[in-house]
Design a protein with these regions (language model features):
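Substrate-binding pocket helix/loop in short-chain dehydrogenase/reductase
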Residues: 2-10
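Conserved catalytic-site loops of classical short-chain dehydrogenases/reductases
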Residues: 7, 34-40, 83-86
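A short, exposed helix-loop element centered on a Lys and neighboring polar residues
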Residues: 21-22, 66
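A short helix-coil junction within the Rossmann-fold of NAD(P)-dependent oxidoreductases
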Residues: 23-33, 75, 122
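Catalytic loop of short-chain dehydrogenase/reductase
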Residues: 29, 36-74, 78, 89-105
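Short, small/polar-rich loop/turn modules that mediate ligand/substrate recognition or access, typified
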Residues: 73, 84, 127-129
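C-terminal helical subdomain
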Residues: 104-194
Length: 197
């Protein structure tokens, strides 16, 4: 991937969301009536081996939305208008993805509209800093990032050797379902290649 390809995708997706968020937040504060900001971030959690620029941009939109939600909350807590910021992470078949094999469930683009309308309506006004997936008839909420396990250095500062000794038996690693699925599919392809010989 060239630097130009990287920059183009980041500019369209991440900078595009930033530009909308910045102007929308300023208008909502000025008119004192509040409102809702909605980011679209399909691909943020299903990292792509072929398009790291797209995955990075979409992951950046998640962080940008969380930052906008925190800013909106601080405005509201200081007596300003109620503004919220959320993301939709849809998985739907489009013309761009029709020929791409999906390992996961997919829906249709029109399945996403009711959730978007809800989040942008007065009924969704109390929903803030959330990431929702919409796939067909299923709607899911993603967890908020937080520390889940901690370890402490027995001395003043960590050494690489202490980390190597302690990490596997204390905080360990979190399983990654997408890498697990990739490994499974690669084994299936390899088995299929061998059976075809």
């Amino acid at each position: 991937m060239s630097e130009e390809e990287w920059d183009a995708v980041i500019a369209v997706h991440l900078k595009g969301h930033f530009t909308v968020y910045r102007h929308a937040m300023a208008i909502m504060r000025k008119q004192e009536s509040g409102g809702s900001i909605l980011g679209i971030t399909s691909g943020a959690f299903t990292a792509s081996t072929a398009q790291p620029n797209y995955s990075a941009a979409k992951g950046g939109i998640v962080s940008l939305t969380r930052s906008a939600a925190m800013t909106a909350a601080s405005i509201s807590l200081r007596g300003g208008p109620a503004i919220n910021a959320n993301c939709l992470a849809p998985t739907a078949r489009t013309r761009m993805s029709d020929n791409v094999p999906f390992a996961f469930e997919t829906g249709d683009p029109e399945d996403i509209a009711p959730m978007a309308i809800y989040l942008l309506s007065d009924q969704g006004r109390d929903v803030n800093a959330q990431i929702y997936s919409v796939v067909g008839r299923r709607i899911s909420v993603w967890n908020q990032p937080r520390e889940i396990r901690t370890m402490y250095s027995p001395d003043e500062a960590w050494t690489p050797e202490e980390i190597a000794s302690m990490l596997p038996n204390t905080i360990k690693q979190e399983p990654n379902p997408f890498i697990d699925d990739l490994e499974r599919r690669m084994k299936e392809m390899e088995a299929g290649d061998k059976s075809g010989d």
